[in-house]
């Protein structure tokens, strides 16, 4: 239990920050799922469009350090590879 005023304030802030970070992580997963769904449907133009928006989302979330930059790079790389594999 937070006993000092400072600790109580940090506990309040942690609740708000956790909710915000969870929302951002959810947005990341949704963006990735959108690309995966377009790839599974075989729609290359939709997959490319979804990837473009997902790339921006992934980068912004990595910049905010919600996910590690290497995880973001890995996600973008795998999505890009999945789209390229559609053409082959």
Curated annotation (Swiss-Prot):
One of its GO terms (cellular component) is cytosol. Residues 1-20 are annotated as: Disordered. GO terms for biological process: translation. Gene3D superfamilies: Ribosomal protein S20 (1.20.58.110). GO terms for molecular function: small ribosomal subunit rRNA binding; structural constituent of ribosome. Keywords: Ribonucleoprotein, Ribosomal protein, RNA-binding, rRNA-binding. The keyword Aminoacyl-tRNA synthetase does not apply. It comes from the Bacteria. Belongs to the bacterial ribosomal protein bS20 family. HAMAP family: Ribosomal_bS20. Binds directly to 16S ribosomal RNA. This is Small ribosomal subunit protein bS20. The gene is rpsT.
């Amino acid at each position: 239990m937070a006993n000092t005023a400072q600790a109580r304030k940090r506990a309040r802030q942690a609740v708000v920050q956790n909710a915000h970070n969870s929302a951002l992580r959810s947005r990341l997963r949704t963006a990735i799922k959108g690309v995966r769904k377009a790839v599974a449907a075989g729609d290359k133009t939709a997959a490319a469009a979804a990837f473009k928006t997902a790339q921006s989302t992934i980068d912004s979330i990595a910049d905010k350090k919600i996910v590690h930059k290497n995880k973001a790079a890995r996600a973008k790389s795998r999505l890009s590879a999945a789209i390229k594999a559609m053409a082959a």
